[in-house]
Structures are given as structure tokens and as C-alpha cells.
Curated annotation (Swiss-Prot):
PANTHER family: FROUNT PROTEIN-RELATED, NUCLEAR PORE COMPLEX PROTEIN NUP85
Function text: Essential component of the nuclear pore complex (NPC) that seems to be required for NPC assembly and maintenance. As part of the NPC Nup107-160 subcomplex plays a role in RNA export and in tethering NUP96/Nup98 and NUP153 to the nucleus. The Nup107-160 complex seems to be required for spindle assembly during mitosis. NUP85 is required for membrane clustering of CCL2-activated CCR2. Seems to be involved in CCR2-mediated chemotaxis of monocytes and may link activated CCR2 to the phosphatidyl-inositol 3-kinase-Rac-lammellipodium protrusion cascade. Involved in nephrogenesis.
Source organism (scientific name): Bos taurus
Protein name: Nuclear pore complex protein Nup85
Gene Ontology molecular function, alphabetical: structural constituent of nuclear pore
Positions of post-translational N-acetylmethionine modification: M1
Keywords assigned: Acetylation, Centromere, Chromosome, Cytoplasm, Cytoskeleton, Kinetochore, Membrane, mRNA transport, Nuclear pore complex, Nucleus, Protein transport, Translocation, Transport
Signal sequence residues: none
UniProt xrefs under InterPro entries: Nucleoporin_Nup85
Name of the gene this protein is made from: NUP85
GO annotation, biological process: mRNA export from nucleus; nephron development; positive regulation of DNA-templated transcription; protein import into nucleus
Gene Ontology CC: one annotated term: nuclear membrane
Compartments reported by the entry: Nucleus, Nuclear pore complex; Chromosome, Centromere, Kinetochore; Cytoplasm, Cytoskeleton, Spindle; Cytoplasm
Assembly and interaction partners: Component of the nuclear pore complex (NPC). Component of the NPC Nup107-160 subcomplex, consisting of at least NUP107, NUP98/Nup96, NUP160, NUP133, NUP85, NUP37, NUP43 and SEC13. Interacts with NUP160, NUP133 and SEC13. Interacts with NUP37, NUP107 and NUP43. Interacts with CCR2.
Amino acid sequence: MEEFDGEPTVTWIPGVNSQKKQMCFDWGPGEMLVCETSFNKKEKSEMVAGCPFIHIIRKDIDVYSKILRKLFNESHGIFVGLQRIEEELTGKSRKAQLVRVSKNYRSVIRACMEEMHQFAVADKDSAIGRQFSSQVSILSAVELIWNLCEILFIEVAPAGPLLLYLLDWVRLHVCEVDSLSADVLGSENPSKHESFWNLVTTLVLQGRLDEARQMLSKEADSNPTSAGMCRVLGDLMRTMPILSPGNTQTLTELELRWQHWHEECERHLQDGTFASNPHLESLCKVLLGDDAALLEHKELLSNWYHFLVTRLLYSQPTVKPMDLHLYAQSSLDLFLGGESSPEPLDNILMAAFEFDIHQVIKECSIALSNWWFVAHLTDLLDHCKLLQSHNLYFGSNMREFLLLEYASGLFAHHSLWQLGVDYCDHCPELGRVSLELHIERIPLTTEQKALKVLRVCEQRQMTEQVRSICKVLAMKAVRNNRLGSALSWSIRAKDAAFATLVSDRFLRDYCERGCFSDLDLIDNLGPAMMLSDRLTFLGKYREFHRLYGEKCFVDAASLLLSLMTSQIAPRSFWMTLLTDALPLLEQKQVIFSAEQTYELLRCLEDLTSGRPLCGEPDAQQLQDDDIETTKVEILRLALARNLARSIIKEGSLEGS
């Protein structure tokens, strides 16, 4: 069970006084709206103008940084590749792949950090430059933590090689010595440079003994009186036993050799070999791993974990992983000396040295401004089978919780939401539910973006979300009077009610303009026209016009009559249909049979009598309208004449 945290972080909103005014707020998936209200439970509300602002509080502002977006995009590819690592791989092959993935993550962090550093240098005097510098420091700390976790949890380095990894770790993250070396070696007489001994000492503190010996040779060349001492100290550095990667000696052999070497260093110190040169004597004390001597160079060590690794190098080179936390804690205490308290970074590194993965993740979650680091590190550690036993108090596992929190921040961005989809896909327990909740809240600002969102939903058989998104797009299209687009979206949503609404708008538009818009869409409805009766009518009515245009009068007449007698046509459209029948009634050839003409007469009488049919709404009394009355009279006359013609024609056919 995960314990609850203490007090939550307080976010101060400029211009808002929560002591005097009550706050109104509304949560969203990626942000919160906050405003002041005049409501007060104790006092009567005064009609005084309050704060006119609505504040938007975003929890993941880093997604809006252009440089960090590169980090998010590139790490997404690494994350997806990691999920595809075959479970069958075991042992060294699987471990090698996981280490390679970890290094890829770190290279992305470092590339992002270097780019941000360039921006910080370019704008060092501006507020933006200071913001970049702050971000560089954060990324540097992130890479420092990740690298240590890689050594301890992924490489799982044993005693011996462990120290080599830690030395590389310190050298990578304490790199001021390189610029110092360039300054000293670039001078006319390096051994006389004011920073010469600082450089030699720093090289020794980092275990770069070959380079330190080269610097001592320069001192020996320029100062013959100390040449012998430099040669002795150089020999001590050269003969120091270190377990190199290709070395086959055992830890026991290494410890014996190191013990002899250590005794030799101590003998030279006691014999006063370097007594006449304080710099060389101080370096010999460093080689002995003397705490006091190391702390004299506190400024050159710069931080406690550098002190820790140097201390281990010269006093416990075969330190076991299980003992690391003891040396780490004592090194931290000695380095701080009670003068200051540990920083959040110190606590995180200490938790790592204690092999407390969950505490590392928890401390990072509190200290960092976004979920990128903890989400990806936790996922990688989960693939190393290190987190299986840890569930959060609300039932989810830690990996999914952190990945989904990170994904929720991506969904708040106008383009990074597509990355968030993949993170949800790889969370088998709650990923689907989270994706369904977030996908409906993506602002559909353009049709191209809407199609991308729909494609995501359709690929995952998210039927309800597809329907919901299509409804939203259909409504937008109706508001913009784009009826064709609205009809297309309503068909895609399989929304019969909305398809009926849009079909009515098409028919109303036809009555006003006398022609249809979006003919290609209506002509190619196909089986989709069966979605609603009104849509069926729209498609069939358009088919009537097509048949009439192709002079297929008999087929057109049969279709027109079936539209009326089947009661699929809205009652308000009957007069239009009867009016459409007039040209067919006036043809030289008899189109409507006597029976069909009787049906048309019945429909006309039903319409003019105002008698509603089968629950059809909006039956209106058209007798008072002179224009409609004229239409009715013309229709009656045309129907009567057609009836007479059809009876004569049918009688003649029977007689023959």
C-alpha cells in the first residue's frame, strides 16, 4: 500500500485574494479555471465590482516548450520500441537491450539539454534566458539521476566494476575540469599557471591518474628540485591497482594488491618523501583516501556524491552494492558538516544508493514539474521486473498511473495528443478508459484534425466516441450552413435523429431555392439512406428528379406516388410533391393510370381537408391562403383531365 503524502503543494495565483473572496473553480483534464465570486456565507453579498478575470491554471506547462517537445517526441519513439522487446529474451541479451534503451533515453535528455544551453547563452540577460538556464539545471539533474539508476538497477554492476561505473558517472556530470585543463595547457608555462595544482588535484579526485601524471611531468621539467618527488608520486599513480573491464583477476587478488599499494603510499608519507612540497604531500594524502585531506578540497569536489566516489576509489575500491548506502550517508554528513540541509536532489540520490526504487520515484514526482521522467523511468524499471510487487492504494499499478498522468498532459496540447494515444494503448488495465475520456475532449479545430481523431477511435473500435465526435462535427457544419458536410457526419455517426434534422434542412433549402445543394452526396447515399425515413425520402425524392431529367416519366410517376402513399414524405411537403406531378399530368402521353390518379386525388383531399395522417405533425389549414387555393384548383383540374384521359385510354385498350 502506498502511503499518503503530507501537505500538497500550494500554487499562488496573482491578483487573487482567497482570504477575502471565495473561489469558484472548474476542473478540466489538463487545466483548471479559477475566478473570484461575491458569494459569502457569513455576510450579505455587496453589489461591488469584483475581479473581472478568469485564471487558467495548467498543470503541465512544459508541453508548451518547443525544445522540450523534441524531448517528448523522440522519447515517444524509444518508449514504443521498448514495449516491443520480446518477452522471450532473457539473461544477457535482454539486459543488453534494456541498457541500450536507457542510454537512448539519456542521449535524448543530453541533446535537449545542450540545445537549451545554447539558447540560455544566447539570451543570458533576459528572463527567457534565465528560464532556459533553470531548465538546463533541471535536465542535468534528471540525467544525473537516470544515469545512477541505470548503473544500480539496470546494469546491476557487481563489486569491482561498480566503482568504474560510478567514476564514469561522476566524470560525465562534473565536467568543469575539461575547461580548466584547456586554460592551463593553453598557457605559455602550464606549471606556473595559477590553477595548475587545482587541475592536478581535480584530475586525481576524478581518478584520471594518467592525465595527472602527465601534468606532474610538466612540473618536473620546469622545477628540477621537485622532479624526484614528482617521479615517485607518478609511480604510485601508475601502479595503483584498478579492476579494468578486460582484467581477469579476482576481487581477492585486487584487494591484496591494493593493500600493498596503499601501505607503500602510507610509507612514503610517513617517511616525509613529499614533506618539502605541500602540493605533492596533499596529493599523497588524497591517494590514501584520507577524509580530512579530501574535505580540504571541498570546492574542487563541488558536491557530496563526487566526494563519495573519490572516497570509495581510494579507500574501498571493491565496495559491494549492498554497502553503498552506508558510505553515501556518511559522505553526505561529512560533506555538509551540519551547515546545511540536504536538497531534494540529495534525497533522491540517497534513495537510489539505498536501492529504494519507489522512494526515488516518489521524490522525483514531488520535485519535478512534469511526469516525463518518472513515467519513462518507471516503465523501463518495470520491464526490468523490478516493480511487480508495488500497487498504489487505489488499485492501479505504479507504471500505469504515471504513464497515464504523463499522457493526460500530452492530451492538453494541440499536436502532442497523438503521442498520448500510444501511452494509453500500452496501459492494459486503465489505458482504454483513460483514452476514451481524453479523446472526446480534444478540441476539433479543423476537419483534418477531426479525421485524425476519428481514425484513432475507429482503429480501436471506440464506437461511442466515434458517434460523439461525428455529432459534434455535424452540429458545427449545420451552424455554418454546410448541409452536405453535416449530413455526411450524421451518417457516419449513425445518428437517425440528426440525419432527419439535416434532411429537413435540405428539403427546406430546396423549397426556398428550387434546387438541391451537394448533389454528389445525395446521389451516392446508397444503403446509408435507410438510416432514417426522412433521409430515405430525401434520397428517393432526388432520384425522382433524376428520372424526370432523364425523361423516364413512368418510373418517375410511380416513385412520386409511392413517396406519398407510403407516408414516408413529411406532410408539409405534400403540396410540393403534388406540384411536381403537374408536368407529368400535362404530358401528351398519359403517365398516371386511373388508379394512380385516384390515389393522387385522395392525397390532395386529405391535404386540403386538414385531416392529419398517422400522427404527422403540423397539419395546417391551407384554404385561407389564396396562392395555395389556386394551386389546389389547378391540381384538381389537371387530375380530372388526366383521369378522363386515362379512363378513355384504358377503355380503348380493353375494347381492342
